[in-house]
Amino acid sequence: MKDLLNFLKAQHKTEEFDAIKIGLSSPDMIRSWSFGEVKKPETINYRTFKPERDGLFCARIFGPVKDYECLCGKYKRLKHRGVICEKCGVEVTQTKVRRDRMGHIELASPVAHIWFLKSLPSRIGLLMDIPLRDIERVLYFEMYVVTEPGMTDLEKGQMLTEEEYLDRLEEWGDEFTAKMGAEAIKDLLGSMDMHAEAEQMREELETTNSETKRKKVTKRLKLVEAFIASGNNPEWMILTVLPVLPPDLRPLVPLDGGRFATSDLNDLYRRVINRNNRLKRLLELAAPDIIVRNEKRMLQESVDALLDNGRRGRAITGSNKRPLKSLADMIKGKQGRFRQNLLGKRVDYSGRSVITVGPYLRLHQCGLPKKMALELFKPFIYSKLETRGLATTIKAAKKMVEREEAVVWDILDEVIREHPVLLNRAPTLHRLGIQAFEPVLIEGKAIQLHPLVCAAYNADFDGDQMAVHVPLTLEAQLEARTLMMSTNNILSPASGDPIIVPSQDVVLGLYYMTREKINVKGEGMYLSGPAEAEKAYRTKQAELHARVKVRITETVVDEDGNSTTETKMVDTTVGRAMLWQIVPAGLPYSIVNQKLGKKQISNLLNEAYRKLGLKDTVIFADQIMYTGFAYAALSGVSVGIDDMVVPPAKYTEIAEAEEEVREIQEQYQSGLVTAGERYNKVIDIWASTNDRVAKAMMENLSSETVVNREGEEEQQESFNSIYMMADSGARGSAAQIRQLAGMRGLMARPDGSIIETPITANFKEGLNVLQYFISTHGARKGLADTALKTANSGYLTRRLVDVAQDVVVTEHDCGTHEGVDMMPHIEGGDVKVALSELALGRVVAEDVLKPGTEDVLIPRNTLIDEKWCQIMEENSVDSMKVRSVVTCDSDFGCCAQCYGRDLARGHLVNQGEAVGVIAAQSIGEPGTQLTMRTFHIGGAASTAAAENSIQAKNNGSVKLHNAKFVTNKDGKLVITSRASELTIIDEFGRTKEKHKLPYGSLLSKGDNDAVEAGETVANWEAHTLPIITEVAGRIQFVDMIDGVTVSRQTDDLTGLSSSEVTDAAARPAAGKDMRPAIKLVDEQGNDVMIPGTEMPAHYFLPGKAIVNIEDGAEVGVGDTLARIPQKSGGNKDITGGLPRVADLFEARKPKEPAILAEHTGTVSFGKETKGKRRLVITRDSGEVYEEMIPKHRQLNVFEGERVERGDVIADGPESPHDILRLRGVHAVTQYIANEVQEVYRLQGVKINDKHIETIVRQMLRKCTITHAGDSEFLPGEQVEYSQVKIANRNLEAEGKEPARFERELLGITKASLATESFISAASFQETTRVLTEAAVSGKRDDLRGLKENVIVGRLIPAGTGFAYHQERQAKRAEAQEGPSAEQATDNLAALLNAGFSSDE
C-alpha cells in the first residue's frame, strides 16, 4: 500500500524552476523528445475506432487509450504497469501520457522554418545577408544558389537562374556545386563561421562612415552575437525532423451519427506526412528532377501551413472554406493559449445572480440566497455531515443535501459563519471590483449588497449582476479577510480619498436633517444635550430644523493619544444635535454643525479615518447610512412639476438677446464682420444669456421669504425639493435644473461644433418639433460615443497594466538622494493644487529648510503625513524635493521610500505591493468617464480675448524669474528676455499667482515691489512682437533699400510713413543676400556696444517687420525699433479626453512640434534654402550647430540673442522626446504628469501623481548606448536601463571605463514589447515576432514580473507571494552551499535507522 501511495504522489510532482529559456531545437533534440516516428497519415480505424499503428494517434508511440490497458487487451490492471506488450507494443500506463508524449516525422528533404524566414526582419536573410526575395526563390525552387564555388569565378551564395546554371555547367563541369531548395540554404548556413563573421563586422563598424551601413551592420552583428552567445546553430532554422504534437492536444472526438470532430492540426499533419511519404517514394524510384522538385516544394508549403498557416501565400482551407488553425494561431490573439487559458481561467465554486439593496446590512456583510449558498458550500456540508456522524458516506450526505433535510440548513449556518465570500462585478476595472464579505443567508434569489460599496463597484440596482466566489483554503480565507474585506478598503487606491461615501438618499437625508429653518416650533429652546434634543423632537415640542442652543460635550484627542472632554453651549439645530449622537468621540462638533452635503460628508469620513482609525470609521459609516435613509424617508422630498419655477426674467433676457443677434446679422450683411466673427459673436451672446437665465432661475429657486419671530420678513434658503437635491449633491446639478426650468441652451452637432440657434424653451414648457430635432441631433452622438469609449478605455488599461505589471516594491530604501521638485500648481492667479496636497504621502528627498533661515524644518526621509502638512502650511513652505518612483535606484521594481504612502492604507507602502498594477488601474478605471471628443474651440467653448495685461488678484509683492529688463525713459521696466515669469508672493513668502511675461512687456512694478489686488502689473501689445533696443543712440539703417529689401507705405489718414521688410523670397535678385538691420551709433558714428558684452547693438529685421522710425533718429533705452505682426493662433482643435491620455502615454510626436534649442549659445541665421531657414547656434566653446527650419514657422528669437538648451525657438505643442533629450528626466516626468492630470481634472477625477510617475518610469526603462567604454554593449544599441546600471557599477568597481548612454522614452505599447520577459511580451501583442526573436537569441526569462508567473502557474512575486518567493530563494541559496561532511554522515545514519525501525 505504501508504495502505491508513493507512486500516486510521484504522478503529479512539479519541478521547481526559476527561469524559462527558449531556443532553437536541434534535430537530435527533437528525436530525443520523440517516442517514435509517425509514418502513416491514418488516424483511427473507422470500424474498430482503435488508433492505427504508426499513425497520428498510434498507441505504441503515444501511449495507451485506456488507463493501464494495452491495445490488444492482453495486459490489464495496475499490477502490469510499466510492461510493454509484446503483441501490440503498447506500454501499460496511465492514458494521460498521451498529453505529453511527442512523436516525430523524418523529413525526406530539409524544410525552412517559416517563422525564421518570413517573420520580419527575416532572420535567415539577415544572417546570410541575402535579400528575402532571393532566399524564397531558392527555397521554392525557382533559382540555384552556389554552395561551393571551387576553382571558378563564381562566388559563394551567388544566385543563378536555370539558364545561367546550365551555361556554367557546360563551362566548368563539376568544378562547382549549386543547389536549390532548403538543402542549399542549410549548406550555406552550416558553412558559416560565426566568430569570423563577427570579427569582420566589428572591423567594418570601425571603418565605415555611412550611417545606413552602420545601422545595417549593427543589426546583423547583434544577430550573429546572439547566435554565438545562445549556442544556437543557424542550421537549426532549417528543419530535418518535424516534432508531432501529443494526440490529446489535437483530439479526434466522435460525434453522434458516426462522424468525427477533429482538430485542424490533424489535417495539417496528414498533409505533411502524405507529401513526405510520396517524396520518399519518388526518391527511391529516382524520378525525374522536375517531379521531385515539385514534391519538395509542396512539402515545404505544407510544413509552412502547419507552423503558421497564411503567413506565406494563401491559407490552406478545410472543407468549409475556413482557413485551418495552425500551431501559431493556437497561441496568439485573445482566443490563443496565452490570453484564453493562461491569464484568465474559469473557476469552480462560483455563482452569479442579480443584486438588490441590503440597507440593513453591516458594511462587512452581503446577503446570499440560501439556494446558492447550499450549492457553493456543498463539500463543506458533506464533510460536516460525515464528521458529525449524520451521514455514513459522502453519497449519503449528498442524498441528504438533495432532499434538503432540516439538519442541512443548520449545518449550512455553521459552515458559513465567518467564512468570507468574494463578490465581483464585471467589468473589474480596479482592485475594488472584487471585495470580500461575510455572507448572511436570505430567502429569495437575489444577492443583497451594502449600498455604501456601490461606488467602488460602480454598481446600481437596475438589473446589474454579480458573481460570488468561495475561497476554499485556509490561506485564501485569511487573505480574503485581512486584505479584501470591504471594511479594509475604505480609501480609494487612486487618490487616497474615502471611497465608502454615501450618495443619493443618504446624502439627502443627512442634508435635510442638518438644514435650519427660521421661526419654526421650538426655536430658541435651551436643551441639556443631544438626548433631550431628540426627546423634544419625538414629543413634537420642537421641529427638526429649529434653531436651538444645546449643551455639547466634545472629546479632544491630542498627539499622545490622551483624551480630554470639553462642554459648551452651541448655537445649532435640533437635527444636528441628534446627528451628534452617532458621531464617534474624538471629532469636533463643528464638523456636523453645518449643512452636510456630499463633500462635507466625505470630509467627515476622511477626518474620522485619519483621527480614529479603521474600526470606528466603519461603524460610523454604517450609522451614517442608517440615519440618512431614515431621515430621507421622513423628509418626504419628491419631484413635482411645480417645483420647477421658471424665472420671470427669462423672457426679457431672450428678447434682448434676439435683438443683439439681429444687429450682428445686419452688420454681417453690410460686410462689417466676417462669417466666422458673426458665428462666434452669436454663440457668445446666447451662451451669456443662458448663464444669466440660469442665474436668475437659481436665485429664484434657492431662497424664499419668511417671517421671523420679530415679525419682519427675512430671506432663507429654500426647501424646494429639486433645489435641495442639487444643493446637497444627492442627484442632479445646476446644469440639469437649468434645462428643466431655465432654457435648454446651445446644442452641439455630432462633430462637436455648436449649432447657433439655441433651444430657448425648457422641459417644463416643452419643446416644439424643430427644437426637439435639434436636441436629438447631438444626443445620439453621445450614445454612440459611450460604446466606443468603453472599448478604448479598456484597451488603454490593458496596455498600462502590461507595461507596469512588473513594478513591485522590492526593498525598503534604495538610498538615492535624487527626487523631483514639487511646487504648487498655479494657473494665472489661482492656486489650483496646494503644495501640501501634492506632497502628502511622499517622502522628502532633501532636508526642507524653514523659509528664510538655515534651520531644518523637515529632515530627509520623512514621510509627509497630515501633521507635517499642517507644519508646512504654518511655515509657508512653497517648494520641496520629494522622492519619486522615476528616480528610484532599485534595479528591479522600486523601493518603499521612493513610492511613499500606500494610498489605500494610509501608511508607508509594504514590500511586495504591486504598485505598477495599481497605478495602471487607477489611471485606466476613470477612463470610461473621460470624453472621446476633440474639443473644437468654437464660440463659447473658449475664445478668451487675447491677453494683453496682468492684473494682480492678491495683495503681496512682485517677483521676477529669469527676466532680463531695461528701464525706459518713463522709468518703466521693459522685458528683454523670452521665458520670463512673474509671480506674486504673499507676506509669508508663498507663491499665490504665476504669470508668463512676453518679450517687450512694460512693467509698472519692479522686482520685490508691493502690489495690491486689482492693480495692473504689466501690459503689452497682444498681436505684435516688438524689437526693443537695450541701448540709447542714433539709428543707422543697414541694407534697407527701398523697393529691394523694404517697401514704404504712407497711411492716407495720418500721413505717417512706415517701412515693411520684404520676405527674402519676394525680393528681387539684387536683395536676395542682403540682411536688413538697424544698428545704433553714437554722435561720432561708432558702433554702440550692448552693456556688459563685446557685441555691437545690431538688430536684424526679419521679413514682415514694420519700422516706424526714420534713419538717423535718436532713440532711448527700451524704445521699440520695429514691430512684427503675429498671426493670432487660429482655432486649433485640442485633443481632449481619452485620446489625449493615450497620446501622452504612447509618447506620440505632435504634428508640428515646438522647436527647442539643442544647445546653449548665440543664435544667428545662415544661408536660406527654398522653403527653409537655417538657424545657427554658436556655442560658447565656438562649436557651431545648424538646423533647418521651415519658413512658415514663426520664430521667437532674433539674430544675436542668447538661448539656453531646451528653450523654445518656435511655438507649438512640445514633443516629450525633445523634452527628455534637452531638459532631462525630471522635466519629461513633470510634463506628462501635468498634461495627464489636466485631462482628468477637467472631469473632476482625482488621481495621485505617483501613479503617473510609475508609468513614466516604465516608459523610460530603455536607453541607447552612445559610447561603449569597456562594456559588452554596442554603440547605438537599445538596452534596459537597469542592465546598464548594473554593468556600469561592476565596471567602476574594477576601475574600467563605464558605458555612456542616453535615456529613451518609449510609448507604452513599445515598452511592453521591449520588456526583458519574452513571456510577458508574447502574451501582449505580436506573439510570433516576440517568440521568433527570443528563440534566435536564446533568451532566458527570469520570471520577475507578475504576468510571467501567472502564465507558468506560480504564485506571483507580489503581495503574499512576495514573501513566499523570498523564502524560496533563501532556501535555495542555503541548499546550494550544501551540508557539511559531518552533517551528511548524521543524515545518512538517521535515514538507515528509520529504515530499520519501519520494517520490523
Swiss-Prot record:
Write down the EC number. Answer: 2.7.7.6
The record's keywords, sorted A to Z, are: DNA-directed RNA polymerase, Magnesium, Metal-binding, Nucleotidyltransferase, Transcription, Transferase, Zinc
- Domain of life, per lineage: Bacteria
Matching SMART domains: RPOLA_N
Q: Which residues bind Zn(2+) 1?
A: C70, C72, C85, C88
Q: Which residues bind Zn(2+) 2?
A: C814, C888, C895, C898
| Cofactor (UniProt) | Mg(2+); Zn(2+)
Region Disordered: which residues? 1368-1400
Q: Cofactor note from UniProt? A: Binds 1 Mg(2+) ion per subunit. Binds 2 Zn(2+) ions per subunit.
> Which GO cellular component terms, listed alphabetically, does the Swiss-Prot or TrEMBL entry include?
DNA-directed RNA polymerase complex
Which biological processes are named by the entry's GO terms?
Answer: DNA-templated transcription
Q: Which residues bind Mg(2+)?
A: D460, D462, D464
GO molecular function terms attached to this record: DNA binding; DNA-directed RNA polymerase activity; magnesium ion binding; zinc ion binding
Reactions catalysed: RNA(n) + a ribonucleoside 5'-triphosphate = RNA(n+1) + diphosphate
Q: What does this protein do?
A: DNA-dependent RNA polymerase catalyzes the transcription of DNA into RNA using the four ribonucleoside triphosphates as substrates.
Which family is it part of?
Belongs to the RNA polymerase beta' chain family.
Q: What is known about its subunit structure?
A: The RNAP catalytic core consists of 2 alpha, 1 beta, 1 beta' and 1 omega subunit. When a sigma factor is associated with the core the holoenzyme is formed, which can initiate transcription.
This protein is called DNA-directed RNA polymerase subunit beta'
Where is the organism placed in the taxonomic lineage, from the top? Bacteria, Pseudomonadati, Pseudomonadota, Gammaproteobacteria, Vibrionales
**What gene, per UniProt, encodes this protein?**
rpoC
